[in-house]
Each structure stands twice: as structure tokens, then as C-alpha cells.
């Protein structure tokens, strides 16, 4: 991804679901205008999720996701289907390609998508080789209670209808979230304290920093940045105290102890807790840390899949803070990327990263799973602020 690209996590996620050989790959190629997905007459050609980023006029940046057929068979087929079901968790809008035999699989998928409150656009593909498209569409409408769009991905017929349907199904709140919310307005002075993150390549900033700076510039704020060691010197160089200080959560305590009394304090992780998830639930759940004992079990979830580093916040620093508070025998499990247990009942607490690499839908899906099992869930920044005794002083 270049510096001018929209991160995939900020794009509208549009997933294509259907049986094997229903034309999902052909449709995604027609929609994107590129040979993004491999097309074959052999059922089951798509064996993993295939994604393609593009812009749709009137909608903006999108990410199309091609999924394996939900009627796959055998042990390997079950694995492919599980990946298809995982894709639902990150889907903002679903394109459901209907077959021409029974509709049991389609109805099951439709029910699952509706249960997750995901807008669905049913599609009847291959009308260029069907003689009964209209009657089949009527039958599908009777079975699924929603009329499909008639298209031919091969001939690119009806593609514009799909784009229009996506626009009409666009969630009203999509893209309306703000990283900094109402914390700052035009002309406010904002100081960003950014330790040199060894996970970021030389000469680069990590994604939350880039996105936050861009939003502050869009709000016409006055933006100043510094590293932790230059924080005191930066304050002295400023004509007035910052309205807001945004820091890396790892140095929360250091910055809190040195900040001007009138400056408000938050962190990138805390801001992303609200931007991607449910900040109020995270703050409420942080109190569960007090109830932990050495026999408790905690799950730490990291969106990134980078190789562990010596001072990794999720694998080293946060566990150290927790065990220092609770005891060395506290059991802590770590998952990364798309790995996330279905059964969370063994855990007394889930702590998630800021999820800059996940879209909001995916994070909210995880929160929903956790809440359904009555497990408290918080966030790196919120947890660190709580462990440092300053959560009530942090703004979000």
C-alpha cells in the first residue's frame, strides 16, 4: 500500500457468496474490470479468500472479497467453507449469487447474513446462457423473499445495476466515524507523542499515526509531533499548551506525569477503540482487571501477524503489567490475525489491540461474540491506562 492509498481497513467490504461455479470470480472480475480472481469451469477453483481494492463512483474506496463456494465437500471443503463463514464477520454488504437447482444453501446463507444485519443483494448470474431467467428469478423471489438482479458477468450485462444496488444498500453510518471525535476543532493545538516504533520500517510511520495526522489536518488543527524523549523540550518550544496530547499507550504514565495541567490526554489505541469498536464497553470492561486472580485466564488479541519482537506491547509489555498487578501465575493466551476463538468462556477477560488493520465491521463482530458469552472485553490503551491508575483522566 502506498502513502496515497486508502487502507483496506477503511474500505467498504463487499463479499460475494454462492455455490461453487456460480460465477463469483467472473463477477468480481467484471465489477473490478480486472482479472482479479481465477476463473474456471471446474467447481471449487477459489480455495481461499481473494480480495481486490477499487473505487466505485458515488461510493468511494471498496474492497471486494471473493469467497469459496458454500456447497464445497470433503474435509478440505469444510475448511474452505469455514473461511467463507469467517468472511461474513468483516462484510458490510453481501452479493449472494443464486444457483438454478435447490435453494437450501442460499436460504441458509441469506438467513445467516440477515441475522448479522448485513445488507444482501441477491444475484442471478449467467442469464446469457439461461432460457428461463425470468421464471427462475420469480422462483428465487418466492423462496428467498427477495428478487435477484439478472446479470451476466461474462457479457458484463447488469453490472451497473449491481453498482447502483451497492450504493442503495450502503449503511447510513459507513465512513461517518471520526478518530478524534469532538475532542478537537479548528485551530486547536494538538501534540502527538510518537516513540520510534521498531515495527515500522525506517522512514515510515505506523498506520494509526498516519490516519490520525491526516484527520487532524482535515479538521484544520495545528499539529505538532515529537518523540518521547523530546516531549519536555517540545512543550517549552510551544507558545501555548496543547489542547490535546495523543501519545502511544506504552508511555501513558510518563506523558501524564509531564503534561501541562490544562492539556487533555489520550492515546492512539484509545482513539481507535472508539473508531473501530465500542469504547464505552471497553472502558466498562476494564474494571474486570481488578477481579482477576492468578487462576484467571486472559486472552490478548492482536490484529497484526508480525513476528514477535523483544518489546512487543501485546506479547511482552502488557502481559508484564498484568502479571505485575495480578501475579506471575496469571495465564495469558495470545492470538493474532484472523485467529479468534469461537468459545471464549474459558477467559475472564479479552484485551484487543487498536485493530488498525481490521475494518469496523470485523471488530464489532468480535465484540458481539464476546458480549453474547458475557465476557468483558477491553483494549490495549484502555487496559494500560487502567493499570497505570489514570483511566479516569483519559479522554475519548
Set out the residue ranges of the language-model regions.
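Conserved G1/Walker A P-loop phosphate-binding module
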Residues: 1-78, 82, 86-89
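C-terminal effector/interaction modules appended to NTPase cores
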Residues: 1-2, 19-25, 203-396
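Conserved hydrophobic helix-helix packing surfaces used for dimerization/oligomerization
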Residues: 14, 190, 296-298
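Short, flexible loop segments at the rims of nucleotide/cofactor-binding pockets, characterized by
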Residues: 41, 70-76, 98-101, 169-171, ...
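Conserved C-terminal guanine-recognition region of P-loop GTPase G domains, centered on the G4
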Residues: 52-60, 75-148, 178-182, 205-221, ...
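G-domain G4 guanine-recognition motif of GTPases
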Residues: 67, 97-101, 118-134, 149-158, ...
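Canonical P-loop GTPase G-domain recognition
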Residues: 115-121, 126-182, 189-191, 220-229, ...
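Long, well-ordered amphipathic alpha-helical subdomains in the mid-to-C-terminal portions
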Residues: 183-209
